[in-house]
């Protein structure tokens, strides 16, 4: 016996494209219906502020590295002065007083602490540069899959914002893999009992009235369960 019903077709795999950063959209490289390959350019966001951030981070790192270099030189000099004071003290205790030796030790400890602090600043500056470059990279959005652009929700000139609180708020476009589609249909209750998982189905689409697609029943959900 044949069961006939109508329903809605959706892609089994559909990826919503959103931005992790805020910025004005300067280029939308595709249109709805375009086929794309994984890695293809979809959207470009104004990168000027993020390029400036990278330049500042690079300058901070260069300054931190220069300071660290000087701090290491000062530490090494203080270490040599302390070693020389200790050597003279061993040669003749009268050549270096306790106060002078203590002063040399203190100067070395201070120089060593400053060198460690400078190295920490270098580490922090490198992390800042990595983050700035990561933010810059996010101004270019590429397709994560092979598929087709099934929705474009924005226009050039609009501001992209992260969808922090709502997926719909940050949605820019949708790319779908239409090689596998699923059909959700509402079947009359009297016909549900005649359906079984794995049953073969023939599907016709309004857009292609002369073509019949073959599928299989993957799930049967009673109406009461759908309303939960």
Where are these regions (language model features)?
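Long, amphipathic coiled-coil "stalk"/hairpin helices in large membrane-associated assemblies
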Residues: 2-63, 91-96, 152-155, 187-191, ...
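Structural motif
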Residues: 20, 28, 45, 71, ...
């Amino acid at each position: 016996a044949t069961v006939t019903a109508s329903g809605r077709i959706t892609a089994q795999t559909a990826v919503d494209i959103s931005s992790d950063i805020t910025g004005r959209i300067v280029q939308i490289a595709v249109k709805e219906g375009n086929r794309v390959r994984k890695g293809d350019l979809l959207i470009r966001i104004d990168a000027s502020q993020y390029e400036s951030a990278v330049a500042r981070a690079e300058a901070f790192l260069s300054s931190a590295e220069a300071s660290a270099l000087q701090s290491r030189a000062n530490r090494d000099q203080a270490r040599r002065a302390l070693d020389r004071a200790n050597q003279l003290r061993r040669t003749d205790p009268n050549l270096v007083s306790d106060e002078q030796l203590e002063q040399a030790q203190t100067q070395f400890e201070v120089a060593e602490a400053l060198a460690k602090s400078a190295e920490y600043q270098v580490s922090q500056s490198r992390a800042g540069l990595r983050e700035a470059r990561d933010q810059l990279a996010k101004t270019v959005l590429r397709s994560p899959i092979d598929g087709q652009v099934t929705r474009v929700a924005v226009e050039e000139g609009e501001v992209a914002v992260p969808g922090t609180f709502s997926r719909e708020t940050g949605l820019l476009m949708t790319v779908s893999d239409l090689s596998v589609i699923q059909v959700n249909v509402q079947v009359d209750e009297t016909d549900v009992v005649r359906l079984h998982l794995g049953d073969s189905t023939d599907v016709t689409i309004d857009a292609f009235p002369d073509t019949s697609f073959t599928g299989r029943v993957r799930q049967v959900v009673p109406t009461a369960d759908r309303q939960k």
